[in-house]
Amino acid sequence: MSDFEIIVGISSLLQVIILNIQNMLEVLLEYIGIHKRRVDISTYYDNVYFFFHFICYHLLSYCIINLRISASFICDSCSLIIMSPSYAVCDNILVT
């Protein structure tokens, strides 16, 4: 992952945390009776969207990075086996 992706991920996570803390405080104040909550369904859906966007973005980026690493390892291992004239060791298995 690049530094830009890490910065964007951290800022997205902080935004989600702040929005959720704000919602929890509103619910707490409403429960105590100090605050009357506005019914704003769009804010709720925005928070859910940001949360799932954050999760999906990082899961997909993690899977894509792992697939690239796995594919690279498999290709390197196969080329090692094909190019080696006699023996090659791949994952502790002796291939002749």
Curated annotation (Swiss-Prot):
Protein name in the entry: Putative uncharacterized protein YOL013W-B
Subcellular location: Membrane
GO terms under cellular component: membrane
Organism: Saccharomyces cerevisiae (strain ATCC 204508 / S288c) (Baker's yeast)
Keyword Methyltransferase: no
TM segment ranges: 1-21
Tagged with keyword 4Fe-4S: no
Keywords: Membrane, Transmembrane, Transmembrane helix
Membrane topology: Single-pass membrane protein
